[in-house]
A protein has these predicted regions:
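A short, conserved, highly charged catalytic patch centered on acidic carboxylates
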Residues: 2-122, 129-153
Length: 153
């Protein structure tokens, strides 16, 4: 992607996650889903990003949904993170990739397709190393990369 000038530098807070071993699998407690889930590389990025949204940026945990199911035609997909505004309208979609997966035009196209079904003001893609945020410019019907994550409204 040629948007490096708009890459957002994130300093994640120190992790304070509950991690356990069960039946040969490593599990992490997801405080949003209120259960232990398998700790995959993508889940590690998601949990750190969620922690950042709530602990650093002050996003209300009660307005964050995880793995929101949507349909693209007949295909069932899941948005990694959906942040809602105070009126419970979808406000931001976040797509998480594992740390060694580069963010690309394909990643951006994936989340834009999600936006067609679940319109939001912001789209975020992150792999925990690189993060990009786009704001939907409704009047111009285009996306603008912005230099920081917005304050929650």
């Amino acid at each position: 992607m040629n948007y490096l000038c708009r890459m957002i530098a994130i300093e994640f807070p120190p992790p304070d996650f509950k991690i356990v071993q069960e039946n040969g699998k490593t599990l992490i407690f997801d405080r949003f889903r209120k259960k232990y889930v398998v700790l995959t590389p993508e889940e590690w990025v998601r949990q750190n990003f969620l922690n950042y949204l709530v602990s650093t940026l002050g996003y209300p945990a009660s307005l964050i949904g995880i793995e929101k199911e949507i349909y693209l035609g007949e295909l069932r997909k899941r948005c990694d993170i959906v942040v809602y505004n105070r009126n419970m309208q979808p406000w931001m979609i976040v797509e998480c990739k594992e740390m060694d997966v580069p963010l690309s035009q394909t990643t951006l196209e994936q989340i834009v397709r999600y936006h067609m079904v679940l319109p939001t003001a912001y789209l975020v893609i992150t792999n925990g190393v690189n993060t990009f945020c786009c704001q939907h410019m409704v009047d111009a019907q285009q996306w603008e990369f912005i230099a920081q994550l917005p304050a929650h409204i």
